[in-house]
Structures are given as C-alpha cells and as structure tokens.
Amino acid sequence: MIREQRLDLPHGISLNCRMAGAPGQPLMLFLHGFPEAAFVWDELLTHFSQAEHGGYFCVAPNLRGYAGSSSPTDVSAYRAKHLVQDIVALKTALGCKDPLSGLVAHDWGGAVAWNFANQHPDLLHKLVIINSPHPGTFLRELKSSAAQQASSAYMNFLIRPDAETLLAEDDFRRLWAFFTNMGADTGPHAWLTAAEKDKYRAVWNQGLTGALNYYRASPLRPPRADDPAAQAITLPAEMLQVNVPTLVIWGMQDIALPPGLIEGLEAYVPDLTLHEIEEGTHWLVHEQGMRVAGLMQVFFNR
C-alpha cells in the first residue's frame, strides 16, 4: 500500500514523498522527471516493496518545486548541487545508514541521479536510468548534432518568462502534447486515461514555476543566436565519470531524447548494462512498467 509523508530536511527543504515497504529494509529511491510527480512510480514502489521482489523500502519524493514539496523562488536553487543535496539529505532522513540499494530515475530525475552517482558513489550500490541523458553525451549532442538541437528546442520555450501561462492555457493543452506526441492516448501502449489525466491536473494546478526552473537554471539547452547555452560549456572529466553499476533502459522512439544520446556512454560508465526497447518512447514507465520492473529485477539480483 502506498502511503505519503512529508519530510523536513536540515537545509530547509521539505519533500512530499510516496512510499511502500518497511523502513529499515534496504532503501530504493525513485526520482521523477518533467512534467510529472512521484505518483508515476506507484506501480514500481509496490512491486519492489513486496518480499518476493526484494522487500525494499521504496520511496519516491516529489522533487523540489513539485506537488507540495518546497519551491524556492530563486532560479539558482534548482542547480544540480542543490538537487543532489536534497537526495543525500533525504537518504539520511529516512534512516538509511548503508548505501542506497538502488537509485532509479527518469528524465530530470535522471539528471539528478547521474550527478548523485558521480559525486557520491560510496552512497549507492546500483543506478537505474530510464531515458535520461548522461551530461557528457547530452552536451556533445547539443553542441554537434543538429537533430538533437531540434529535438531539444522545446527547452528554449520552457525558459520563457510566460511559459507557465502558456502551458496552463486551454486545460494544459501544450503539456498534454508532451505525452500525446508519443502515442500516450492512441499508441499500442496507450496509457493516458481520464484517471491519469486527473492525477496530472492535480499536480499542475499546484503551479508550474518550480518545474520550469529546472530548465531555467541549466545551461544544457540548444544554443540560440542570443544565447550560446551548451556551446559555452565545458565539463571536466571528473564531473562525468560514474563508477557504480548502472542499468540504462532506453525507449528508442523518444522524440525528445533520441538514441544518439546513448552512443559512447560506456566511456563514462564502465560498468554499464544497456537495454534498448525498440518500440518504447520517453514514457516507458507508463507504457511498460512491468517490463521495466523485470529488467530492474534481473539487474538487482545480479
């Protein structure tokens, strides 16, 4: 059974969390992306909390800026170092003294998780990434690939000062398109039911500014005539290496994050298991949640 708890962290941030399983069991954290919230993990929280699937203590926070968690007004509060700090503090607040058994993440949650694994490999046994680019390959593609620049052009829309207003128009029409453009309502793995829409509306009606501030705080976006963005960035090698066993699950039909982003990933992640799902899109957790769970189970049982 899923339960909710708000946790106050020592640095002044509070995170609303969804959780399943018994505190004290090996801890697995799940980090959502944009424009989602912790509820997207409910099926996996329940699955991995069950004794026959490992009996983990499974926790999914609403990241800062989302769905009742703290939403600082300063855009700089959404930089990676602060987001990683939240997860380190959350681990401690949950009473976990051992390394995390697993950190599972998608989209923006993956950006946080890649950084966490780079900075704190001693706090983590295994990393699972679902359609979230490693900063090294993402920077390379944003600089050199016209296709990736086009695929990521929406980022420059999301940093507009009026993005919140535009996204909320006409019952969030533009936000629904993030899903329906990849078959969420009509594809072979359609998942965007009326009930799911109600869950999203409940999140979005609490405000969009925190979620959009992730994009505003990051220079990893396509360059424009008036903004060099990614072209102005160089990331040192020590910020890119991930020295924990990592499973990357990639939906190959992701129109925002195409497969070029997984090329050369092994240069940054020596212990890499890569599983490509040919018909999958960016929304794999919705489309094929139990297939994702099965791949994770094999990885965690290794």
Question: Which residues make up each language-model segment?
Answer:
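Alpha/beta-hydrolase fold catalytic core
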Residues: M1-M28, S49-F57, P270, Q297-R302
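Flexible "cap/lid" subdomain of the alpha/beta-hydrolase fold that forms the substrate-access gate
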Residues: I2, I13-L15, V40, V59, ...
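Residues at the C-termini of beta-strands that transition into short coil/loop
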Residues: D8, G21, N62, N131, ...
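Conserved HGGG/HGGXW glycine-rich cap/lid loop of the alpha/beta-hydrolase fold
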Residues: R18-S70
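Proline-centered flexible-loop/turn and helix-kink motifs
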Residues: P35, G54, P121-D122, P270, ...
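Hydrophobic residues on the short alpha-helix immediately C-terminal to a glycine-rich phosphate/catalytic loop
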Residues: L44, F116, L295-F299
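Hydrophobic "lid"/C-terminal helical patch
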Residues: I87, K91, V292, M296, ...
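Catalytic histidine-centered segment of alpha/beta-hydrolase-like enzymes
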Residues: G280-G289, A293
